[in-house]
Swiss-Prot record:
The protein's name: Iron-sulfur cluster assembly protein CyaY
UniProt-listed CDD domains: Frataxin (cd00503)
Cellular component terms per the entry's GO annotation: cytosol
Gene: cyaY
Family: Belongs to the frataxin family.
Annotated keywords: Iron, Metal-binding
InterPro entries xrefs: CyaY, Frataxin/CyaY, Frataxin/CyaY_sf, Frataxin_CS
GO molecular function, one term: ferrous iron binding
NCBIfam families: FeS_CyaY
Source species of the chain: Salmonella schwarzengrund (strain CVM19633)
Function: Involved in iron-sulfur (Fe-S) cluster assembly. May act as a regulator of Fe-S biogenesis.
Length: 106
């Protein structure tokens, strides 16, 4: 994958997150902000989830209260380079914990 393809795929990931949060009807307020290629989810309790792109590595990084994760694109899924879990599963788990209610991005 070249840099422009990586950015196109990362942009699509950011857009999907925004769209899913816009259509989410949970009780918790989750704000989504994109600034300089960094996507920040802010929760009512003051906690945050930070998602950013690491262009030199062609990775997406996820920072949560539970820890940090690095994802490589394998096929059409972003996969954690340590656990093998998908980006969507880990993001959903972290958002659920930080929102205090079930949040799904699938």
């Amino acid at each position: 994958m070249n840099d422009s393809e990586f950015h196109r795929l990362a942009d699509a990931l950011w857009l999907t997150i925004e769209e899913r949060l816009d259509s989410w009807d949970g009780d918790s307020d989750i704000d989504c902000e994109i600034n300089g290629g960094v996507l920040t989810l802010s929760f009512e309790n003051g906690s945050k989830i930070i998602i950013n792109r690491q262009e030199p590595l062609h990775q997406v990084w996820l920072a949560t209260k539970q820890g940090g994760y690095h994802f490589d694109l394998k096929g059409d899924e972003w996969i954690c380079d340590r656990s093998g879990e998908t980006f969507w599963d880990l993001l959903g788990q972290a958002a659920t914990q930080q929102a205090g209610e079930k949040v799904s991005f699938r």
